[in-house]
Design a protein with these regions (language model features):
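General small-molecule cofactor/ligand-binding pocket signal
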Residues: 95-100, 231
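Conserved acidic residues
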Residues: 194
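Sec-exported extracytoplasmic/periplasmic mature domains
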Residues: 25-32, 87-94, 115, 123-131, ...
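Short helix-loop capping/hinge segments that flank enzyme active sites or metal/cofactor-binding pockets
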Residues: 49-67, 116-185, 234-243
Length: 285
């Protein structure tokens, strides 16, 4: 289901880096039904599992994007976990460049990196999904009233969007995303970095139904606008039981490097705690 079709990407959600890489080995590469993946032809590794290196952090140069987690916009406990993650990365042999500065993070509002094209993409998607269905457009969804009240305004706002070819906002977004891509690439080149690091979220998870507490979602700040790959790995817990993540972002086609970094970090820190609601599976299942 499209949300931002020009930014959306399907990736594995898994218990461990090993599991995520096993899935990635299957889904990575060119898909004729997804034109965006055409650029990956000739760039896919024969196997990504070979980059699972327990010593993968050693020698990596990692830039810290503190603009995404200042004391003013980040939960104090998340800050502590991030500082510990940086200490762990240093202990594992990484060279930490702290901080690095990406001017466009300050000059481009986060919302101006996304074109609201949902209406056009969902109107294209639904008829192809089920040609005989009664609901074929966003307008049909709105008329049905079969949606959560919390998203009603957003649905009406998306329905009011002008055609993409006439949408001035989307034209500006296209320019902004190019600026952000070039800025991130330049910072990495200027500092000879292998990857950038920052907390995936600046605040702990919110309670279900809480739409007002700050959430501080950093995961879409750099990766979707640039198209560069990123991997999140657990970096501990806050409030005893709420997980927080470390996001590691690299250049285009740098998945092998990212896998080395996150696997080495995961194996050395072992932050994951299986939830009590999901007991271990018997061996081989």
């Amino acid at each position: 289901v499209p949300l931002f079709l020009d930014k959306d990407i399907g990736g594995p959600l898994a218990r461990t880096v090993v599991d995520a890489v096993a899935i990635f080995d299957v889904i990575a590469g060119y898909d004729p039904a997804d034109p965006v993946t055409a650029a990956s032809q000739g760039k896919r590794a024969d196997s990504y599992s070979k980059f699972l290196d327990k010593d993968g952090v050693r020698g990596m140069r990692l830039g810290v994007v503190r603009q995404l987690f200042t004391p003013q916009n980040t939960d104090p406990d998340v800050m502590k976990r991030m500082e510990q993650a940086l200490a762990d990365l240093r202990r594992l042999g990484a060279q930490i460049v702290d901080p690095v500065h990406i001017a466009e993070i300050d000059t481009i509002p986060p919302g101006m990196l996304f074109c609201f094209r949902f209406k056009f993409d969902i109107n294209d998607y639904l008829p192809r999904l089920a040609p005989g269905a009664q609901v074929k457009t966003l307008e049909d969804i709105i008329k049905s009233t079969k949606f959560h009240p919390s998203i009603e305004k957003r649905l009406h706002d998306r329905q009011a969007e002008p055609p993409l070819a006439e949408n001035q906002r989307c034209m500006q977004v296209a320019q902004n995303t190019q600026r952000m891509r070039e800025a991130v690439q330049k910072v990495m080149d200027d500092n000879t970095l292998d990857a950038l690091v920052y907390p995936t979220w600046a605040f702990p998870p919110r309670m279900i139904g809480d739409l007002n507490t700050p959430h501080g979602n950093n995961s879409p700040r750099l990766s979707p606008p640039t198209g560069f790959p990123a991997i999140t790995v657990p970096m501990g817990f806050v409030r005893d039981s709420l997980p927080v993540g470390l996001q590691v972002l690299g250049r285009a086609w740098s998945e092998p490097t990212l896998i080395k970094i996150v696997y080495g970090y995961e194996q050395a820190t072992r932050h994951r705690r299986p939830p009590a609601s999901t007991p271990p599976l018997p061996a081989g299942q």
